[in-house]
């Protein structure tokens, strides 16, 4: 059986503010922003080159029952972490120092406006279509 990870819900306090951060600061692509029913909003954003998206919204248990800021360490894999950090800093994102943990693996951390944390990850041996 084959399965694909499609969506990771991200709990936020203000959908518009979070959407702006992910699209304008992190460069995610807006795939969906719909209000399919009264009191329900679904926003789906995808990092460029990724098959998996993040979701945020209101009026659904996946969004309303999780406390904002509780997602920790969602990994964003990049080919060149120094370049990615420089680009994000240039867009006004606070990014922690790059940490080389050995074995060709490097990490850097950042947070969205609600305190959900994201981890930039570079694995020098995992490039191209493999990451």
Where on the chain are the PLM-derived regions?
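Core segments of cupin and vicinal oxygen chelate
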Residues: 2-3, 10-52, 90
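Helix N-cap motif at beta-to-alpha junctions
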Residues: 14-15, 79-82
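Short amphipathic alpha-helices within nucleic acid-binding modules
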Residues: 21, 82-87
């Amino acid at each position: 059986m084959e399965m694909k990870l499609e969506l990771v819900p991200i709990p936020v306090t203000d959908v518009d503010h979070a959407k702006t951060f992910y699209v304008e600061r992190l460069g995610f692509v807006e795939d969906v922003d719909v209000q399919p029913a009264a009191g329900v909003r679904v926003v789906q954003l995808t990092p460029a080159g990724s098959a998996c998206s993040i979701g945020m919204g209101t009026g659904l248990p996946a969004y309303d029952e999780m406390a904002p800021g509780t997602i920790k360490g969602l990994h964003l894999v990049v080919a060149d972490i120094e370049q990615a950090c420089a680009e994000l800093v240039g867009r006004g994102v606070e990014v922690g120092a790059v940490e080389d943990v050995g074995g060709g693996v490097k990490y850097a951390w950042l947070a969205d406006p609600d305190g959900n944390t994201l981890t930039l990850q570079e694995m020098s041996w995992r490039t191209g279509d493999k990451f």
